[in-house]
Swiss-Prot record:
<dbReference type="InterPro" id="IPR052064">
    <property type="entry name" value="Mito_IMP1_subunit"/>
</dbReference>
<dbReference type="InterPro" id="IPR019757">
    <property type="entry name" value="Pept_S26A_signal_pept_1_Lys-AS"/>
</dbReference>
<dbReference type="GO" id="GO:0006465">
    <property type="term" value="P:signal peptide processing"/>
</dbReference>
<dbReference type="InterPro" id="IPR000223">
    <property type="entry name" value="Pept_S26A_signal_pept_1"/>
</dbReference>
<dbReference type="GO" id="GO:0004222">
    <property type="term" value="F:metalloendopeptidase activity"/>
</dbReference>
<comment type="function">
    <text>Catalyzes the removal of transit peptides required for the targeting of proteins from the mitochondrial matrix, across the inner membrane, into the inter-membrane space.</text>
</comment>
<dbReference type="GO" id="GO:0004252">
    <property type="term" value="F:serine-type endopeptidase activity"/>
</dbReference>
<keyword id="KW-0645">Protease</keyword>
<keyword id="KW-0472">Membrane</keyword>
<dbReference type="Pfam" id="PF10502">
    <property type="entry name" value="Peptidase_S26"/>
</dbReference>
<feature type="active site">
    <location>
        <position position="35"/>
    </location>
</feature>
<protein>
    <recommendedName>
        <fullName>Mitochondrial inner membrane protease subunit 1</fullName>
        <ecNumber>3.4.21.-</ecNumber>
    </recommendedName>
</protein>
<feature type="active site">
    <location>
        <position position="80"/>
    </location>
</feature>
<dbReference type="GO" id="GO:0042720">
    <property type="term" value="C:mitochondrial inner membrane peptidase complex"/>
</dbReference>
<dbReference type="GO" id="GO:0005739">
    <property type="term" value="C:mitochondrion"/>
</dbReference>
<keyword id="KW-0999">Mitochondrion inner membrane</keyword>
<dbReference type="InterPro" id="IPR036286">
    <property type="entry name" value="LexA/Signal_pep-like_sf"/>
</dbReference>
Amino acid sequence: MAGMFRIPIAVVQIAAFVHQIHEYLFQVQMTSGPSMMPTLNSGGEFVLLDKLHGRFARSCSVGDVVVSAKPSDSKQHVCKRIIGMPGDTIYVDPTSSNKKITIPLGHVWLAGDNIAHSLDSRNYGPVPMGLIKAKVIARVWPHPHWMSNILNDIDVE
C-alpha cells in the first residue's frame, strides 16, 4: 500500500522544486515591443531571467538589461537597460537637451536601447531599485546566446 503513494509523492516533490526554481531563481519569459531593439527584437524573443540578482538590485550594474515593474503600473513589467546607478549624474535625454540629473540613493535610471521607441526613465524618472524583478542573462530563442554588458565604464580624468 505504501508503494502506491511513491509516484504521486515524487510528482508533488518535483513540481514543488520546479515551482521554487521558477519563482525565486530563474524564469524564461517572452519579450515584446521595439524598445530594446536591436538587442532584443520586437517579434517576441524568449529570454532567461536571473531572479536572484533581480531581488538584490545592488548586484546589478550599468549596462545590465533588467526586468522591472513599471513605476506607473506595478502590474506591468518593462525590459530596459540600466544607464545610471545611485549617485551617477546623467543626461536626462541626450538626444534633445543638456538637462542633467543625479540619481538618488536606492534608484536606477533605465532606458531602452531603441531610444526613439522607448518609454523609460526619461518619461517616469529614476526607478526605485525595489521595482527591479530580474536580470536578463541570456536569449533562449531564437539564436541563443548569453547577454553581455555592452556598456563600459569611461575613466574620466
